[in-house]
Amino acid sequence: MKLSSTVAALAAVFAIGAAAPAWSQTKTIYIGMNGGPMEKAYTSQVLPDFEKANNVKVVVVPGTSSDVLAKLLANRNSPQMHVVFLDDGVMARAVSMGVCQKLDDAPVLKELYPFARMKDDIGAGVQLGMTGIGYNTKLFAEKGWAPPTSWMDFANPKYKGKVVFQSASSSTFGLHGFLAINRLMGGSDQNVEPGFSKWSTTVGPNVVEYIPNSAKLSEMVQTGEAGIFPLTPTAVGDLQDKGIPVGYANPKEGAVLLLVDLCVVKNNADPQLAQKLAQFLLSAPAQSKAAAAGKQIPTNEHATMTPAMQKSLGNLDDLVKKVTVVDWDSINAHRAQWDQRWNRQIEQ
């Protein structure tokens, strides 16, 4: 009897040992997003909670929104990535190219600000951004200037030689700034003629340099070359963390909404787990951690921000009521023409 019991016990141990690799093996899931501060915030503070709860490893594939989309298009039938973060303009292109699949109907979608839900829930905003006005606080203090208050301040002659503008053909910040100014000149997202035709006599004379992206801003602020420029509160916060003397001003006409959207990648290898990750990233706990770790402004109305973020942004509910939402379908339909005209006419 004892021998039989021992044999049975050993058999059970070996059975468990043989089965262990099957049930303890960790799956890997891939998410595409911007590198830098965003990647650091998510990998250090947000994604570990999902990994622990689901016994998975989440690997970030870093890159700009355009880079991530290019990877999706190159491998659309067997994509490596399961979920992607894309700037809203690029996401609109991704959706039109059929690389996203609809989000599952989940309670978390009802917790989002209404503008963060994409049409037919093909994706959703995971981080709220807004392009407003960044300015050099050291320079403004030395000159005795009050902080800027309007998009039309870019055309104020007192800022001659101190305006830095990102290229509208390569930067969402630059495009947003141009469209906001175009709107105040009588244009719209469908009609950019006022902005193009009046630029050379309004904003143009004040511009010291057009830059392809915002990477050069920290250097130009420190040397005093850059005084005023389109930028987001999150980007301003990142520069402040490096000791760069910058501030953010919300234009009285309203900042321009800049969402980072997420979508579940069509044809991904584990759609059920991908949907679960998407729902987690849209949740209040995940977005609260992203806010604390990387100044990511939440799209979930139940998420919380740090006191410093609240002080800098003010009441978020009031702020989002004033943001300008651009028509990405119209913009993307004409973007190639606008880019050529910008490069030829504005940055010649």
Task: Please give the residue ranges for each predicted region.
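Early extracytoplasmic/lumenal segment of secretory-pathway proteins
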Residues: 25-92
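Extracytoplasmic ligand-binding site segments that recognize negatively charged/polar headgroups
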Residues: 36-43, 80-81, 85-219
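A ligand-binding cleft/hinge motif common to bilobed small-molecule-binding domains
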Residues: 89-93, 222, 227-245
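Periplasmic-binding protein-like
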Residues: 129, 197-203, 210-211, 242-266, ...
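A bilobed periplasmic-binding-protein/Venus flytrap-type ligand-binding module shared by bacterial periplasmic
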Residues: 134-139, 182-184, 259-271, 289-290
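Mature extracytoplasmic/periplasmic domains
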Residues: 265-323
